[in-house]
Curated annotation (Swiss-Prot):
Protein name per its UniProtKB record: dCTP deaminase
Taxonomic placement: Bacteria, Pseudomonadati, Pseudomonadota, Gammaproteobacteria, Alteromonadales
Oligomeric form and interacting partners: Homotrimer.
Pfam families: DCD
GO terms under biological process: dUMP biosynthetic process; dUTP biosynthetic process; nucleobase-containing small molecule interconversion
Residues forming the catalytic site: E138
One annotated GO molecular function: dCTP deaminase activity
UniProt-listed Enzyme Commission number(s): 3.5.4.13
InterPro entries tied to this protein: dCTP_deaminase, dUTPase-like_sf, dUTPase_trimeric
Pathway: Pyrimidine metabolism; dUMP biosynthesis; dUMP from dCTP (dUTP route): step 1/2
Enzymatic class: hydrolase
UniProt binding sites for dCTP: R110, S111, S112, L113, A114, R115, D128, V136, L137, E138, Y171, K178, Q182
UniProt keyword Protease present: no
Species of origin: Idiomarina loihiensis (strain ATCC BAA-735 / DSM 15497 / L2-TR)
Length: 195
């Protein structure tokens, strides 16, 4: 069952859900907690490689990703990040989220941004039980105009769903947790996938 606004507030107060920095009351509504854009981005560099063979060896995949992924782009608070039509970018939330082993989070982009063509998460919208860290956002501009994004803007919302019990393998306890404690716009670590 998803938590309502008063339950979210109580879970935050009791330290069951962790959010840093602590959210303001006006960022909690209905069944969601608003999240904001951080100032850390990465982009795929044009024409850096003809393709990435994601079925290749771990070493080949890692080398290809390193070749096409930009270094971190860290913006000052007053700078804008422009995402042009047809472009993909990674970004990070301002907030760091910590979930217990018996709760899953669900990230939704803002409808107002989608109506301008901005996809906030291309596919990954589940926040696993036991997660702790910032959330990497996978942006895609499917609209017709460039969009200027700034750190601190409201970018989406998270809802929280209580599970029937704690997971036996929460994210923070898994040895194969590729993005544990992430605090930047971490590039794909698909090369670390098991067999």
């Amino acid at each position: 069952m998803r938590l309502n606004d008063t339950e979210i507030e109580q879970h935050l107060k009791d330290g069951i859900i962790g959010v840093e920095p602590a959210p303001q009351a006006n960022n909690i509504s209905g069944v969601t907690l608003d999240i904001h854009l951080g100032n850390d981005f990465r982009v795929l560099q044009d024409h850096a490689a003809p393709f990435i063979d994601i079925s290749g060896s771990r070493e080949a995949i890692e080398a290809a990703i390193q070749e096409v992924m930009s270094d971190e782009i860290v913006l000052k608070d007053d700078q804008a990040f422009f995402i042009h039509p047809g472009e993909f970018a990674l970004a990070v939330t301002h907030e760091s989220i910590t979930l217990p082993a018996d709760m899953v989070g669900w990230l939704d982009g803002r409808s107002s941004l989608a109506r301008l063509g901005l996809m906030v998460h291309v596919t990954a919208h589940r926040i696993d039980p036991g997660w702790s860290g910032q959330i990497v956002l996978e942006f895609f501009n499917s609209g017709k105009l460039p969009l200027a994004l700034r750190a601190g803007m409201k970018i989406g919302a998270i809802s929280f769903e209580k599970l029937s019990g704690p997971c036996a393998r929460p994210y923070n306890k898994r040895e194969d947790a590729k993005y544990r404690d992430q605090h930047s716009a971490v590039a794909s670590r698909i090369s670390a996938d098991g067999g």
